[in-house]
Each structure stands twice: as structure tokens, then as C-alpha cells.
Amino acid sequence: MISKQEYQAQAAQGYNRIPLVQELLADLDTPLSLYLKLANRPYTYLLESVVGGERFGRYSFIGLPCSHYLKASGKHVDVYQNGEIVEQHDGNPLPFIEAFHNRFKTPEIPSLPRFTGGLVGYFGYETIYNFEHFAHRLKNTTKADPLGTPDILLMLSQELAVVDNLSGKIYLIVYADPSQPDGYERARERLEDIRTQLRQSCAIPLSLGSKHTEAVSEFGEEPFKACVNKIKDYIFAGDCMQVVPSQRMSMEFTDSSLALYRALRTLNPSPYLFYYDFGDFHIVGSSPEILVRRERDDVIVRPIAGTRLRGKTPAEDLANEQDLLSDAKEIAEHVMLIDLGRNDVGRISKTGEVKVTDKMVIEKYSHVMHIVSNVEGRLKDGMTNMDILAATFPAGTLSGAPKVRAMEIIEEVEPSKRGIYGGAVGVWGFNNDMDLAIAIRTAVVKNNTLYVQSGAGVVADSDPASEWQETQNKARAVIHAAQMVQEGLDK
């Protein structure tokens, strides 16, 4: 931990949030047990990672209760402090959010991962109406909104625990405010409070089961198939090459959202595992796909397109993999999305600094396997994170190509707002690094109802029945996890 003198020196350099860090051994705890001890209240989060579906990432992140958060819907933003609105803004929320983020000047913490605090939460799909370079082409008509969640919700994470899964160490981080005369002492006292919480045992909320319920489609199978045929008409007319319609499913769910996270991380480990407690609703997800990642001046997108079910035996698994890589439709769709990714990254990258890596590799998850590629670029000078978001949002894999025309068609054919689905979840650090996943394989739990949404990439030779089945396959992991909880994880 830095000394009072080091703290004062950093304050003199103009930093207005200064991290105090305490390193402890926590090898007898898991990220889940640490979350239960330190967080497990509204406006907290747990972020984990399993690389390539098979290997746990080195770091997990636990957000302690956030006193400040932003909610944006339409052209209005509310800033909350301890549950009370303390600031409001009317107009495009994105410049305001960027300016809010930029209020905080922090020094980097050596030897820790790139994320050590900042904004954490989501940008819902309807954020598209705030990107001025294409919003004028969208109608933004009033649609049914069964979830009623904010378009954007971001927490200001100034107290967190970073778990090093390799060493068994935990790093407790509390940001001090040097504008407060006793800011250093307050932060030290808060760290001691957190250490006290760590020493206590946590009450494990047992999942003993509840009544079994089935998921019901909001769209319906036949209307969805008709939607696929309508999109194919647009494709044959030359309007577009691909569109990704989606359908939402819902089911009664009265169990713990944290139990759902436990089931999902066991059933479908993915590069982005996340649990957000937003008070009146929870987001529980296991996304395989980056929307965009910024590390200093490098930017990465990772299109995923092409899906097969996992085999029941190693031989069947290999056969499904070979079948996927030899499927002309799936390959054509994936190549199209690589090109779209190159175009998106190219808009914000230096000339000649865009490259495709990991071209068309197979990644395997619990229920499905995908074709995956990497597109990387070196940012042009002066690019902001909102420039990056504007260039890459929404993901081509959740909209189609050309992207704007595909979004117009989605707006026409889908019956309700997408909400969080198809948007982005993740972190935007104080250091300006950003790591956002696409909000897929994601449940929203609100008012004793679980919602999950999934889409299918429609191209010229799509079969409506197959596309319907693809949406079922993609939702299967979340629905299965919910039913595992209903059966009881701890019976």
C-alpha cells in the first residue's frame, strides 16, 4: 500500500482518485465465496473468464456496492448517488457518459491487470439510436418493452477485489478522494472493514429447487419462420446479404439469480462470465464473443459465426467440427463477418494496421461449437472510446450486413425492443482500456421472470426451420441452467 507521502505526491500531480491496494492470500476462497462475503447486494458484480471454453482466466473481479451509477433511457441520463438522483442530462447520453468517465484521473497500478476500477455495466441494443452517423436512417418507433430496463446502465466501481486465480492472492482496491482532507485515512479504514468481512464465514444460500417451468417464445415459431422468409425477400431484392433476427423466450423463475450464475458457469463456461445485481433486476451471462477490446492503442474484435451442436462422443464431436468447416453457407457467412469486422476496425485504425489473426478456428462450448476469427488494429491518434463504440456497435454477428440496412430490417420485423440482448456488457477502466462482450447467452431476471433472447443469421439459402432451431440451440444453455436451479443445485 502506498504511504501518505506517496499519496500526497500523486494528488499533487493532479490525480483526483488514488487507489490504495492491499494484497492478501485468499487461496481457501473462490470468486463466488468472495462475492458472497464482500458484495451480494444491489449494484455489485462478479466477472470471471474461461478461455476457449476450457481454461479459467487468471483474474476474476468482484465489485463491492457502488454508490454512484448512471441510467440512460432514450435521450435522458440520471446520475445516482446512494440511490438519489444527483445529476441529470437531456440529449445524447453518449458524450455525457464519456465526459463523466473523464472526470476521474487515476494513476495506474503496476503489476495488476489492466482493469482496476472504472465504469462497469451494459450498453443495451437501443444505444444504436445515439450514434449519429446512422441513427437518422432508423425510425426508432415505439415498441413493446416487456423488460423495461434502462438502455444503458453503468456503475462507477471505486471499491473492488481482484482475484488472482493463479497465485491465490486477492487485491483489495479502494479509491481515495484527495479533495477530502481525510481521504487517505478513510480509504485505509475502508480497506480494514473489507478485511474484516473477508475473515468472516459466509452463509451459502442453498439452491434446493422449486417448481419446474418451461420457456415460451414471445415471437412464436410460425411468425419467426415468416420473418425469415420476409428477410430472404429483401436479400433477393438486393437490399442486404444477411440479417440476424432474434426471438425472446421467457419463463417463470423464482429462484436466486446467483444460483442461476452458479449453474451457467458450470454448464457453459465462456470467456465472459458475468453476474450483475442492479437491485430490481439481475443480468446473468456466459458470452463467448468480444464486441470490442481496447488495450492501450490496440483494438480487437472477434467475430463468431457458424454453429454446430457438440457431439455426444469425441468421434461425433470431430465429425460435427468437420461438417461445420465444410459447410459453404457457414463459411460464406463467416467470411462476410470477417470483412465487416475489418471494415469496422478500419474506420478507427491507422492505414495498413488492420490484420486478421486466428482465422476460422473452432471454439467449443458446452452445447455448441463456433467458427471464430480475430481482427486487430492499431488506433488512429485521438480516437476515443466512444469513437470505438460507434465503429463497432452493434456487432455484425447480431445485426447483419450491410449493418445499417440490416438494422432497419430488424427494426421492422422484430415485435419488441431488444433491450440488453445484442448490446454490450463489460468494463471501461479508469485507464481508458475497455473490454466489452456481446450480450448473448444472457439472462435478464426481473419480477420472477427470466428472459433470454437468441438470433440466427439469415442468408439467401437459409431454411426457416433450421434458423428457428438455431435460436433454440443458442438459448438452450441458459434455459438448461435455469431448469438445473429449479431441480435444486444443492439437494
Curated annotation (Swiss-Prot):
Catalytic activity: chorismate + L-glutamine = anthranilate + pyruvate + L-glutamate + H(+)
Keywords tagged on the record: Amino-acid biosynthesis, Aromatic amino acid biosynthesis, Lyase, Magnesium, Metal-binding, Tryptophan biosynthesis
GO terms under biological process: L-tryptophan biosynthetic process
Residues reported to bind chorismate: G306, T307, Y421, R441, G455, A456, G457
Signal peptide segment: none
Top-rank EC class of the record's enzyme: lyase
Cofactor(s) needed: Mg(2+)
GO molecular function, one term: anthranilate synthase activity
Positions that bind L-tryptophan: S49, P271, Y272, L273
Classification via Gene3D superfamilies: Anthranilate synthase
UniProt xrefs under InterPro entries: ADC_synthase (IPR005801), Anth_synth_I-like (IPR019999), Anth_synth_I_N (IPR006805), Anth_synth_I_PabB (IPR005256), Chorismate_C (IPR015890)
Residue positions binding Mg(2+): E333, E470
SUPFAM superfamilies on file: ADC synthase
Pfam families assigned: Anth_synt_I_N (PF04715), Chorismate_bind (PF00425)
Notes on activation and inhibition: Feedback inhibited by tryptophan.
Documented EC number(s): 4.1.3.27
Pathway the protein takes part in: Amino-acid biosynthesis; L-tryptophan biosynthesis; L-tryptophan from chorismate: step 1/5
Cofactor: record remark: Binds 1 Mg(2+) ion per subunit.
UniProt subunit comment: Heterotetramer consisting of two non-identical subunits: a beta subunit (TrpG) and a large alpha subunit (TrpE).
Similarity annotation: Belongs to the anthranilate synthase component I family.
Job of this protein: Part of a heterotetrameric complex that catalyzes the two-step biosynthesis of anthranilate, an intermediate in the biosynthesis of L-tryptophan. In the first step, the glutamine-binding beta subunit (TrpG) of anthranilate synthase (AS) provides the glutamine amidotransferase activity which generates ammonia as a substrate that, along with chorismate, is used in the second step, catalyzed by the large alpha subunit of AS (TrpE) to produce anthranilate. In the absence of TrpG, TrpE can synthesize anthranilate directly from chorismate and high concentrations of ammonia.
PANTHER family (alphabetical): AMINOBENZOATE/ANTHRANILATE SYNTHASE, ISOCHORISMATE SYNTHASE MENF
NCBIfam families according to UniProt: trpE_most
Name assigned to this protein: Anthranilate synthase component 1
Source organism (scientific name): Neisseria meningitidis serogroup C / serotype 2a (strain ATCC 700532 / DSM 15464 / FAM18)
